[in-house]
Amino acid sequence: MPLIPTENKLAIYRYLFQEGVLVAPKDFHLAKHPQIETVSNLDVLQILRSFKSRKFVTETFNWQYYYWVLTEEGIKYLRTYLQVPESVVPATMKKQASRPSTYTRSEETKRTGASGDFDPSFNRGDRRQGGDRRGGMGRGQYRTERSAPAPQQN
């Protein structure tokens, strides 16, 4: 691991433990990291490359951005390194509270389902009785009014 100032290392470790995830663009010349302003992007990339090799984070690379997520081993390591109590967990491990419903319907206004008067034969019309065919013509004998009559066979 390259020589990185201790303040930068601690800032990266604290941010990673607090959030549980870290995103960094693949830009080795970027002066400041987008989320951690006091640290260069190169420092973040180098530290998390080291974390990946020790299996403290899982890495995903997509569209020129690195995405790192802490693993259980990484949480244990950072907890001992930063001397954080067991009660403190990263934001990705916290359960989100269920959102309170802004609108609740009373029992009278709730829909109870179909009323039971659905009749599927209504949509079919009278096709079963041959209503979609011209009168008197059976299957395969359809012709338009303008067409000539079928030739007579002798």
Swiss-Prot record:
Disulfide bonds: none annotated. Keywords: Cytoplasm, Ribonucleoprotein, Ribosomal protein. It is found in: Cytoplasm. GO terms for molecular function: inositol hexakisphosphate binding; RNA binding; structural constituent of ribosome. The keyword Ribosomal protein applies. Residues 91-154 are annotated as: Disordered. Residues 124-135 have a biased composition (Basic and acidic residues). One of its GO terms (cellular component) is cytosolic small ribosomal subunit. Belongs to the eukaryotic ribosomal protein eS10 family. This is Small ribosomal subunit protein eS10. The gene is rps10.
